């Protein structure tokens, strides 16, 4: 297992300082929100993509994943009309291309409010979503990346694919090589799922993992048993990234202290520091 951290854990102007902290704690990669690349990431200039990728790689931290794919775009919804889905598809294709340009092989599709089905029946919603993600999975496969579906519990305002088993079954139904499963420790805690059982069920389509707490609190502060999660990961032979996902905290809190604390917790529980024993 290798350590990565999402850059939503620090301010946009603190990348250099955060990178130093990550390297000091043995991180092997960074996860990125597209809006941190530029204001309109779906139109990111090639020069900016190259420079942003180089910034992280020069520090020994390749970009391993993208998350918050639809941040700032509440207008892009999966279960609107055909025109709305076309706009959503165009956005996600652009972000898939951005991921490929950044060298990120995984994209985490969470976006709970963009995929609310509301009054739409579940079967109808699944039919729409299967066709939509089958096409996007093909695009992702062609670009050499995986679009990974993240379970979003109802506590996050979601009502479609709210737990890990639903995501696993959905990805299997789509059956597209470019579509993967993403698992999240905070989500599993909220849905009261058994991590060993879920990890065993996820199978070969499982592509990425977030070490998180409910509500994206500081990792180690929310009651998730990360030592038990790590044991489950080792039990299934997980060899991917354990990516820390948490916010930088409310005003008046220190993102540095939060990040230092989380990195210590994750390395102790998962053994993810570079040079530590692998899974």
Spans of features found by a protein language model:
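Histidine-acidic metal/acid-base catalytic patches
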Residues: 1-4, 9-26, 89, 103-104, ...
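Active-site-proximal loop/turn and secondary-structure-junction residues that shape catalytic pockets
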Residues: 9-11, 34-36, 69-72, 113-115, ...
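Active-site acidic/histidine proton-transfer and metal-coordination neighborhood
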Residues: 16-17, 58, 75-180, 190, ...
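Short amphipathic alpha-helices and their capping/turn segments at secondary-structure boundaries
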Residues: 16-23, 42-62, 89-103, 130-139, ...
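Residue-level detector of anion-binding/catalytic polar loops
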Residues: 28-29, 62, 105, 146, ...
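Glycine-rich, proline-tolerant flexible connector loops at the mouths of alpha/beta enzymes
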Residues: 33-53, 111-113, 117
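Short, flexible/disordered intra-domain loops and linkers
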Residues: 38-43, 157, 252-257
């Amino acid at each position: 297992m290798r350590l990565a951290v999402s850059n939503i854990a620090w301010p946009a102007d603190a990348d250099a300082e955060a990178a130093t902290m990550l390297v000091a704690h043995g991180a092997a990669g960074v996860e990125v929100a597209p809006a941190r690349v530029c204001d309109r990431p779906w139109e990111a200039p090639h020069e900016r993509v190259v420079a942003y990728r180089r910034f992280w790689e020069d520090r020994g931290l390749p970009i391993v994943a993208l998350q918050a794919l639809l941040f700032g775009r509440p207008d892009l919804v999966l279960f609107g009309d055909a025109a709305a889905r076309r706009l959503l598809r165009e956005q996600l294709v652009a972000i898939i291309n951005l991921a490929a340009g950044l060298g990120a092989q995984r994209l985490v599709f969470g976006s709970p409010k963009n995929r609310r089905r509301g009054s739409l029946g579940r079967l109808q919603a699944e039919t729409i979503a299967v066709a939509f993600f089958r096409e996007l999975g093909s695009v992702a496969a062609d670009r050499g990346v995986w679009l990974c579906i993240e379970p979003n519990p109802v506590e996050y305002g979601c009502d479609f694919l709210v737990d890990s088993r639903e995501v696993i079954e959905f990805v299997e139904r789509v059956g597209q090589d470019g579509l993967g499963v993403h698992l999240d420790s905070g989500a599993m805690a909220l849905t009261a799922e058994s991590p060993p059982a879920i990890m065993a069920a996820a199978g070969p389509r499982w592509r990425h993992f977030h070490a998180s707490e409910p509500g994206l609190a500081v990792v180690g502060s929310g009651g998730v048993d990360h030592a038990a999660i790590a044991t489950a990961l080792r039990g299934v032979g997980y060899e991917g990234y354990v990516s820390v996902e948490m916010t930088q905290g409310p005003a008046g809190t220190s993102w540095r202290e939060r990040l230092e604390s989380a990195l210590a917790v994750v390395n102790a529980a998962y053994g993810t520091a570079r040079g530590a024993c692998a899974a």
